[in-house]
Design a protein with these regions (language model features):
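Solvent-exposed coil/turn segments that connect beta secondary-structure elements
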Residues: 7, 37-40, 62-64, 92-93
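Structural microenvironment flanking redox-active thiols in thiol-disulfide oxidoreductases
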Residues: 13-54, 65-73
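Thiol-/selenol-based redox modules, centered on thioredoxin-like
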Residues: 82-135
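Sec/Tat-exported extracytoplasmic proteins
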Residues: 5-8, 20-27, 91, 124-132
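Short, internal strand/loop/helix patches
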Residues: 49-92
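Short active-site neighborhood of thiol/selenol oxidoreductases, capturing the structured segment around
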Residues: 1-13, 19, 32-33, 112
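Structural recognition of the beta-strand scaffold that forms the well-ordered cores
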Residues: 1-3, 31-35, 58-61, 86
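A short beta-strand-turn-helix
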Residues: 1, 21-25, 98-101
Length: 135
C-alpha cells in the first residue's frame, strides 16, 4: 500500500499510529510505504512526524516522490489529487479495488482522506485472500 501524506496534514497525523498497527498486524504479507507530498521538508521533519505520531513504517521524503505519485495517479486515471491522505493498494503489480469510505456502495482504486483501520483491514483480507485469513 502506498500512502501519500503530509507532515502538516491533520488526518495524516491522526491515522499514522493506526497505519503502524495495520502494518504490524499484517507484516508477513503486507508492505506499507508513506510518501511525502505537497511539501518540501527535511528528513528531520519527517523523523519528527514519525516519532510524534507513531508512523513506524517506511517513509520516503525523496524528491522522486512527486514523479512516483504522478505515475500512480495516471495509472488509476485520477485527474487531480488535492487532498491528503491518499492511498492505493497493489498486489502483484495490479491496483486493487478498495472500499469507498464516503459511499459504502462504491469501490475505487484509492482511499481519500482518513480511513477507519477496520475498513482497511477488511479490504486487505479480501485482497490477500483465503490463505492469508487462515494465517
Amino acid at each position: 500500500m502506498l500512502d501519500f501524506f503530509g507532515t502538516f496534514c491533520a488526518p495524516c497525523k491522526q491515522e499514522a499510529a493506526h497505519l503502524t498497527q495495520l502494518w504490524r498486524k499484517n507484516a508477513q504479507n503486507f508492505v506499507l510505504v508513506g510518501l511525502t507530498h505537497f511539501e518540501e521538508v527535511s528528513d528531520e521533519v519527517v523523523r519528527e512526524f514519525a516519532n510524534t505520531f507513531g508512523a513506524y513504517y517506511f517513509l520516503s521524503n525523496s524528491k522522486q516522490n512527486a514523479r512516483i505519485i504522478a505515475q500512480v495517479l495516471q495509472d488509476i486515471n485520477y485527474q487531480r489529487m488535492e487532498q491528503l491522505p491518499f492511498k492505493v493498494a497493489l498486489k502483484d503489480g495490479v491496483y486493487q479495488q478498495l472500499s469507498n469510505n464516503f459511499d459504502k456502495e462504491k469501490k475505487g482504486y484509492f482511499y481519500l482522506g482518513a480511513v477507519p483501520s477496520e475498513l482497511m483491514q477488511k479490504d486487505l483480507n479480501a485482497i490477500l485472500g483465503k490463505e492469508y485469513a487462515k494465517n
